[in-house]
Regions:
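Active-site mouth loops of central-metabolism enzymes
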Residues: 26-43, 80-96, 117-123, 146-159, ...
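Alpha-helix-loop-beta-strand connector modules within alpha/beta enzyme cores
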Residues: 65-87, 124-146, 169-170, 186-214
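Glycine-rich phosphate-binding active-site loops on the catalytic face of alpha/beta enzymes
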Residues: 81, 85, 105-118, 169-187, ...
Length: 254
C-alpha cells in the first residue's frame, strides 16, 4: 500500500465527519460539468442532457466536438468540449484547429488533455510548450481552459504538484484530474496536490475533479477539501466536478 493510499483513506474518514450543511447539495449541483462523452450519443440523449443542465443550472455541459451543433445555442449554461482527448497524443496543429472550430460553434470552455506521455517521458518542455500554445489560443478566443493531467499516470503527488505549478504559470483557468477513460480516476491525494499548488502560487486557477465521481459523498469530500484548503466557499468559478451520473444521484437526496 502506498503513502497516497493511506492518505486517501484517512482523509476520507476525516471528511466524513463534516456536517452535511458545510457544503449543500445545491452548491454541488451548480458546480457540475454535466458530461456525455460517448461518440455514439443519440440526438435524444443530447437533448435530455441539455434539458437536465438547464433545469438544474449546472456549471457547464461537456461533450464531444461533433455533438456541439445539437446542443447549441446555450443560454445561461457554459458549454465545454474536449480536445486532445483522451490520450493526449494529437499533433498540436490538430488540437489548435479543433479549438478554432469549437470557438466558431460558440463553445465557452475547453477541456484539453496535457500531452502527459511526452511529459512523463522526460520531454517536459515540449509538453509545456504545446500547453502554452493552447493557452494562448484560448485566451485569444476568450475561452476558459481546463488542462487535464490524467493524474493516475503520475508517479507521486509531488509530481502532480510540480506539473500543477507549471500549468499555473501558463495561466490555465482550471487544472483537471482525469479524463475518466483510464482505470485510475481522481483521488483525494491528487486533489491535495493540485490544491496545494494553487494555494502556494496564490493563483486564481481553479480545480476540476473528474474520473469516477458518481456518489454524493464523494462530491462532498472533494468540495469540503477544496473549501478547507483554499479557504473560501466553492462556486463554479473555481471548483468543478466532471460527472455524467452524479446529478441524478444528488437529486435523489433532495
Amino acid at each position: 500500500m502506498t503513502v497516497e493510499n493511506h492518505l486517501n483513506k484517512i482523509m476520507e474518514k476525516l471528511l466524513d465527519h463534516f456536517p452535511k450543511q458545510f457544503v449543500t447539495v445545491e452548491q454541488l449541483i451548480h458546480s457540475i460539468d454535466l458530461t456525455l462523452l460517448d461518440e455514439h450519443a443519440t440526438t435524444e440523449a443530447l437533448a435530455q442532457l441539455k434539458q437536465d443542465a438547464q433545469q438544474n443550472q449546472v456549471a457547464a455541459l461537456c461533450i464531444y466536438l461533433q455533438h456541439l451543433p445539437e446542443i447549441m445555442p446555450q443560454n445561461s449554461i457554459s458549454t465545454a468540449t474536449v480536445i486532445n482527448f483522451p490520450q493526449g497524443m494529437e499533433p498540436l496543429d490538430v488540437s489548435l484547429t479543433a479549438i478554432e472550430k469549437a470557438a466558431l460553434l460558440g463553445v465557452t470552455e475547453i477541456d484539453y488533455v496535457l500531452p502527459y506521455s511526452l511529459y512523463l517521458a522526460g520531454q517536459t518542455q515540449k509538453a509545456l510548450q504545446q500547453c502554452h500554445a493552447i493557452a494562448q489560443l484560448c485566451k485569444q478566443h476568450k475561452l476558459a481552459l481546463k488542462v487535464i493531467l490524467e493524474s493516475g499516470t503520475f508517479p507521486s503527488i509531488q509530481a502532480i504538484y510540480t506539473i500543477s505549478r507549471e500549468l499555473i504559470d501558463l495561466e490555465c483557468d482550471f487544472i483537471k484530474t482525469s479524463t475518466g477513460k483510464i482505470a485510475q480516476g481522481a483521488s483525494i491525494s491528487d486533489a491535495v496536490a493540485i490544491l496545494s499548488a494553487i494555494k502556494d502560487a496564490n493563483a486564481s486557477c481553479g480545480i476540476k475533479i473528474s474520473g469516477g465521481i458518481k456518489k454524493p459523498q464523494q462530491a462532498f469530500h472533494y468540495a469540503v477539501l477544496a473549501e478547507l484548503m483554499i479557504d473560501k466557499p466553492i462556486n463554479k468559478n473555481w471548483f468543478r466536478i466532471g460527472a455524467s451520473s452524479l446529478l441524478g444521484e444528488l437529486l435523489k437526496t433532495h
